[in-house]
């Protein structure tokens, strides 16, 4: 029965039940009343631990199970891999399904558009963007998510990246400005990642011809001719200067 199913599968979310819809709704109601399950969102329930009175699923497990194609992305993906400089009370979920941002158990679940051919890996019971995909996505969207300083800090915690996979992510995005940004970021972080000259040549070839600004209202901007980019003299220097996490634009 449903109760036994819950007890045997403590790491599973309850989406559907057995029997008629009426019977299923009644069972769910009874389990909610007893505090055995909680509603996360419509048609999505999570088992509650009798010992801790907390959901048995982590925020990342919940997020990656919201829909069949859902996966954890951006700063939340850094957190899954253990490279989050800070823990946010937000969980970024990429999916083709539309949903309104919602809060459950003190965490705000935010919808992110799932890009075609996004590279997804399985980390335990969590579907999450690969480390390379996470870094490229975070560089692309730092003005919307986390801010440039936090992205830099997270990247500095990453022990290494596969440069070919980074290039594959860039090719899938097919965005000249993103090539400029990534060329600049990885050149500034060459000490950490040791990418080859071929990587930077590919970024140069993919870059837009337009001169762009990495950040707004920065007094430290200089023109980086190779990337046609107005950006700080030192990217890592931003950490010491304490740039506001959201005072940036892409």
Could you tell me what each predicted segment is?
Residues 1-10, 14:
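Single conserved hydrophobic/aromatic residue that forms the stacking wall/gate
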Residues 6, 55-56, 131:
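N-terminal alpha-helical segment
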């Amino acid at each position: 029965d449903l109760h036994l199913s819950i007890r045997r599968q403590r790491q599973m979310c309850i989406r559907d039940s057995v029997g008629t819809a009426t019977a299923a709704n009644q069972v769910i109601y009874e389990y909610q009343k007893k505090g055995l399950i909680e509603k996360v969102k419509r048609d999505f329930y999570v088992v509650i631990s009798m010992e801790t009175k907390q959901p048995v699923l982590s925020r990342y497990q919940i997020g990656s199970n919201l829909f069949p194609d859902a996966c954890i992305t951006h700063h939340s993906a850094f957190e899954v891999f253990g490279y989050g400089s800070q823990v946010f009370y937000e969980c970024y979920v990429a999916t083709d399904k539309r949903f309104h941002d919602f809060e459950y158990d003190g965490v705000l679940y935010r919808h992110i558009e799932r890009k075609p051919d996004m590279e997804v890996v399985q980390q335990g019971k969590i579907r999450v963007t690969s480390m390379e995909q996470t870094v490229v996505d975070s560089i692309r969207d730092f003005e919307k998510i986390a801010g440039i300083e936090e992205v830099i800090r997270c990247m500095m915690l990453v022990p290494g990246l596969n440069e070919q996979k980074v290039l594959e992510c860039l090719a899938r995005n097919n965005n000249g400005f993103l090539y400029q940004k990534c060329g600049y970021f990885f050149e500034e972080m060459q000490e950490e990642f040791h990418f080859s000259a071929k990587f930077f040549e590919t970024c140069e070839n993919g870059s837009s011809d337009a001169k762009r600004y990495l950040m707004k209202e920065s007094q430290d901007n200089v023109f980086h001719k190779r990337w046609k980019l107005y950006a700080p003299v030192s990217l890592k220097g931003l950490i010491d200067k304490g740039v506001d996490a959201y005072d940036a634009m892409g």
